């Protein structure tokens, strides 16, 4: 903790990096190296300065770590979008939310599949029972007179006086 907050330590590391970089720079083939080195120096300084500042800010402001992490992730995502990247940084909380959502959807799908399979099994059993009932009866045992309502039908010889009772009769009405 002392090394993280010690400004002298940070300055000595920066001085060491700069002296190392200047010795490397004497080579004429390293034209773009100073730009890379300056970016690395700035990043290292930001890293060393942000950790103690973040710890002090968390203790004094009493805001949660998740809020600060969310703010930092949002800032980095905005910077990535400005730079033209389509990728985004996600936190563990977002990943856990997404996995929970996927697991919930998978459970719902499994319940749906279970319901559908039980319905299909019931339908197959019903079809089997219908098939068994159809296969048990022989065709010549079925009395078709019940099916076409011909049980009480009389033939021409059985009609009274030989007249067809279904023929229309003349009806006269008084006016």
Swiss-Prot record:
Give the main localization category.
host cell
**Localization:** Host rough endoplasmic reticulum membrane; Host membrane, Host caveola; Secreted
Q: How is it modified after translation?
A: The N-glycosyl content is primarily Man(9)GlcNAc, with a small amount of Man(8)GlcNAc.
Task: List the ranges whose topology is Lumenal.
Answer: 1-28
Instruction: Tell me the first and last residues of the signal peptide.
Output: none
The answer to keyword Ion transport applying to this record is yes
Keyword Calcium: yes or no?
A: yes
| Positions annotated as glycosylated | 8, 18
Question: Topology with regard to the membrane?
Answer: Single-pass type III membrane protein
Q: Where along the chain is Ca(2+) bound?
A: 120, 123
From the record, give the transmembrane residue ranges: 29-51
For domains, the record's comment is: Binds 1 calcium ion per tetramer.
This one is known as Non-structural glycoprotein 4
Species for this entry: Rotavirus A (strain RVA/Cow/United States/WC3/1981/G6P7[5]) (RV-A)
């Amino acid at each position: 903790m002392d090394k993280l907050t010690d400004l002298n330590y940070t300055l000595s590391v920066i001085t060491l990096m700069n002296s190392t970089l200047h010795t490397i720079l004497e080579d004429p083939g390293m034209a773009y190296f100073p730009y890379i080195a300056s970016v690395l120096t700035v990043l290292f300084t930001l890293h060393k300065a942000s950790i103690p500042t973040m710890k002090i800010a968390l203790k004094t402001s009493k805001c949660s770590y998740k809020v600060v992490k969310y703010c930092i992730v949002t800032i980095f995502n905005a910077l990535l979008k400005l730079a033209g990247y389509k990728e985004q940084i996600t936190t563990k909380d977002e990943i856990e939310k997404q996995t929970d959502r996927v697991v919930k959807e998978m459970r719902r799908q499994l319940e749906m599949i279970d319901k559908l399979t039980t319905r299909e099994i019931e339908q197959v059993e019903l079809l089997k029972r219908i098939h068994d009932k159809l296969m048990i009866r022989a065709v010549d045992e079925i009395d078709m007179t019940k099916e076409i309502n011909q049980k009480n039908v009389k033939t021409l010889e059985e009609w009274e006086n030989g007249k067809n009772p279904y023929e229309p009769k003349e009806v006269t009405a008084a006016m």
